From Swiss-Prot:
Gene that specifies this protein: mutM
Lineage: Bacteria, Bacillati, Bacillota, Bacilli, Bacillales
GO terms of biological process kind: base-excision repair
Residues involved in DNA binding: H92, R111
Protein name: Formamidopyrimidine-DNA glycosylase
Start and end residues, zinc fingers (FPG-type): 239-273
Organism field: Listeria innocua serovar 6a (strain ATCC BAA-680 / CLIP 11262)
Length: 273
């Protein structure tokens, strides 16, 4: 699933491509992908509106239109492509926004897990999807004091806590593994067993890793590309995720993989305690 760095790069490329385009037709080929509003109402609300900006909150893309905002979650395989109206529509194209300039923004999703919903303009914070999201890790709202408070009051594994979008928005499986490794903390450690120094290391690792991942275009470990079809580069920086059996870059101990709450979890058994 694309995490915050990947979604941010999709946002940035879309921001270059679609503002100023006016929607004159919306085609929904898979109705279940439209949530919170009947698909026909979704279509009715969008026709005639102009895209003004593309924002992001956590793993959600936010399209600000003339009178409303669209929330879109890519889930596992969702992708946006800006194409000419005459280009072939593939079988994995499920939602099409047709513009007056004869281009189309197409949403493709092999798994059909992606979702879209429409809300009042700038009203995303009132939706069930977003109202409980925690702070963005690369903003001043992400503070050590609040992060430490959240960590100390849960006995869940620290990796599980990092994946809780109420604690910090946008961290997923890949970056949670990398954060724990950078902080030298075993992913199975109970969050409330961590010392203040360990919590601080995790906090700083979250900021530094997410910053670099955004700068490098995210991680392409499966099929991720941005909305211009470009691969991410941070996968070349990964130290534990997907490295099962490979030597730790610090001590040489083989990286291990376990299941933690159903998630594949990678770590160095020597460096992470």
């Amino acid at each position: 699933m694309p995490e915050m760095p990947e979604v941010e790069n999709v946002r940035a490329t879309l921001q270059e491509l679609v503002p100023g385009k006016k929607i004159d037709q919306v085609i929904v080929r898979v109705p279940k992908m439209i949530v919170a509003t009947p698909p026909d109402e979704f279509v009715h609300m969008l026709v005639g509106q102009e895209i003004e900006a593309v924002r992001r909150r956590g793993k959600f893309l936010l399209f600000d239109l003339t009178n409303c905002t669209i929330l879109s979650h890519l889930r596992m395989e969702g992708k946006f492509r800006l194409m000419d109206e005459n280009e072939e529509v593939t079988k994995h194209t499920h939602i099409i926004f047709h513009f007056e300039d004869h281009t189309e923004l197409r949403f493709l999703d092999v798994r059909k897990f992606g979702t879209m919903e429409v809300t009042n303009k700038y009203g995303e914070s009132e939706t069930k999807s977003i109202k409980k999201l925690g702070p963005e890790p690369l903003t001043p709202a992400f503070t050590l004091a609040d992060f430490a408070t959240g960590v100390k009051k849960t006995s869940r594994a620290i990796k599980t806590a990092l994946l809780d979008q109420k604690l910090v928005a946008g961290v997923g499986n890949i970056y949670a593994d990398e954060i724990c490794f950078e902080a030298k903390v075993h992913p199975e450690r109970a969050a409330n067993s961590l010392s203040d120094k360990e919590i601080n290391r995790i906090f700083e690792a979250t900021k530094s890793i997410m910053t670099e991942a955004v700068a490098l275009g995210g991680s392409t470990v499966r099929t991720y590309v941005n909305s211009q079809g470009k691969l991410g580069q941070y996968q070349d920086k990964l130290k534990v995720y997907g490295k099962t059996g490979e030597p730790c870059v610090i001590c040489g101990t083989p990286i291990e993989k376990i299941k933690l709450n159903g998630r594949g979890t990678h770590f160095c058994p020597h460096c992470q305690k």
